[in-house]
């Protein structure tokens, strides 16, 4: 795991005689998080292909968003990114996703609402006018959830900022699968380590 550093594992591959598991490198990728997220969707919805997934928040700095975009589009999901203009990367549509800056565009149509953690540094770095304004426009609360599908899944890679990305009653509510993501993460990462140890099939 390399916070703030991108691509070290790629440089290391030619000189190491070992498998490398990327547990998160800078803003680039977080493959095991995407695997557990997709596993959770499949477990709950029975499929990934055709699901409408909205990824909401700081896409620009999110390795979780990038890995989920790659995985979900590969498996046939319909992915829409939603967030402030300043936090959506230029050219991101080239990855086969839609982009909107209006939460209402995704609230009523999405099967999954995946919220991303917003770091306080984004306000300090002038990406946002204020955290409070972000929460007002892009945060999910019970009132906004009334517009969502009755079987929508609320996901978050953690740690959450309660009162920013989502309110406490949403995080702990009936639509939230955040704790399931954590539980599934143990099994998924165990499976990755098992396969990387040289085992190709489950015994």
Segments from the language model and where they lie:
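Glycine-rich phosphate/diphosphate-binding loop of Rossmann-like nucleotide-binding domains
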Residues: 38, 43-116
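General beta-strand structural signal in soluble alpha/beta enzymes
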Residues: 19-23, 30, 55, 81, ...
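Single conserved hydrophobic/aromatic residue that forms the stacking wall/gate
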Residues: 1-11
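A glycine-rich, Thr/Ser-enriched phosphate-binding loop motif common to dinucleotide/cofactor-binding enzymes
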Residues: 25-40
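Rossmann-like adenosine-cofactor binding region
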Residues: 92-169
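Adenosine-phosphate binding glycine-rich loop
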Residues: 151-203
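Short, ordered loop/turn segments at secondary-structure junctions
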Residues: 8, 25-26, 84-86, 118, ...
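Short, structured coil segments at secondary-structure junctions
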Residues: 9, 15-17, 75, 93-95, ...
């Amino acid at each position: 795991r390399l916070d703030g550093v991108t691509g070290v594992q790629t440089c290391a591959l030619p000189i190491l005689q070992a498998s490398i598991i990327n547990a998160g490198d800078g803003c680039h990728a977080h493959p095991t998080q995407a695997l557990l997220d997709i596993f959770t969707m499949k477990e709950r919805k029975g499929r990934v292909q055709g699901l409408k997934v909205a990824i909401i928040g700081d896409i620009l700095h999110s390795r979780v968003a990038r890995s989920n975009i790659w995985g979900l589009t590969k498996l046939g999901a319909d992915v829409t990114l939603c967030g402030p203009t300043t936090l959506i990367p230029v050219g991101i549509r080239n990855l086969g996703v839609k982009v909107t800056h209006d939460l209402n565009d995704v609230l009523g149509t999405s099967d999954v609402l995946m919220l991303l953690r917003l770091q306080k540094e984004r306000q300090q770095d002038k990406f946002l006018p204020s955290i409070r304004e972000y929460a007002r426009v892009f945060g999910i609360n019970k009132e906004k959830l009334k517009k969502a599908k009755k079987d929508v899944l609320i996901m978050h890679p953690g740690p959450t900022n309660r009162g920013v990305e989502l309110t406490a009653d949403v995080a702990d509510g009936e639509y939230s699968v955040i704790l399931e993501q954590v539980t599934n993460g143990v099994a998924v990462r165990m499976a990755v380590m098992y396969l990387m140890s040289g085992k190709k099939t489950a015994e």
